[in-house]
Amino acid sequence: MTAPNILILGIGNLLWADEGFGVRCVELLNERYRFPDGVRLMDGGTQGIYLVQHVQQADCLIVFDAVDYGLAPGTLKIVRDDEVPRFMGAKRMSLHQTGFQDVLALAAFSGAYPRELLLIGVQPEELEDFGGSLREPVRAQLEPALRVALEFLAERGVVAAARDGDAERLAPAPLALGRYEAGRPAEELAYRHGDIRFIPQQPLEDD
């Protein structure tokens, strides 16, 4: 019997506080564990529709994400199979979620759709802090979220082995959690609402 292709996907935007939850989960799994052939970890970031081909190739899809369930900040909620698309479209707070809902729809339309879906989502606390990191209620759910994924895999005979060396990075080194937070500017120096280079400025008045 051929082993299933399993895709473990983290989606979100590291630059917008709790939006980075999904990517941080996959980052930690990659740092700590080695997985058997057929299991792939991917930082999906905000790629949206460009993830279709990866979803089509998966027999089993595990997604980590920050999702507005309308619950208390930091609440971890697990959704499976046919319910997943509904929650990926609930009270959308970022462009990538719209894109990923479309990813699932296109994969289903093509006939190449995962047999199993698992969404491990956390209710965010803050999304409007550009350059910010995870808030404490959300950060506290990283370990529980990893346990859910590892238990789900173990139930299917997929065992993660502890790494004994450095892993190949899924994202550029400066975005690793420790370096990212260490390089965060002080509050009085930072602009937390976006990249000022791309925000329209009021024209200067002539003297």
Curated annotation (Swiss-Prot):
It comes from the Bacteria. GO terms for molecular function: aspartic-type endopeptidase activity; enzyme activator activity; metal ion binding. InterPro entries: Pept_A31_hyd_express, Pept_HybD-like_dom_sf, Peptidase_A31. Ni(2+) binds at residues 19, 65, 96. It comes from Azotobacter vinelandii. One of its GO terms (biological process) is protein processing. This is Hydrogenase expression/formation protein HoxM. Not known. Could be involved in the processing of hydrogenase. Gene3D superfamilies: HybD-like (3.40.50.1450). NCBIfam families: hupD (TIGR00140), hydrog_prot (TIGR00072). Keywords: Aspartyl protease, Hydrolase, Metal-binding, Nickel, Protease. SUPFAM superfamilies: HybD-like (SSF53163). Belongs to the peptidase A31 family.
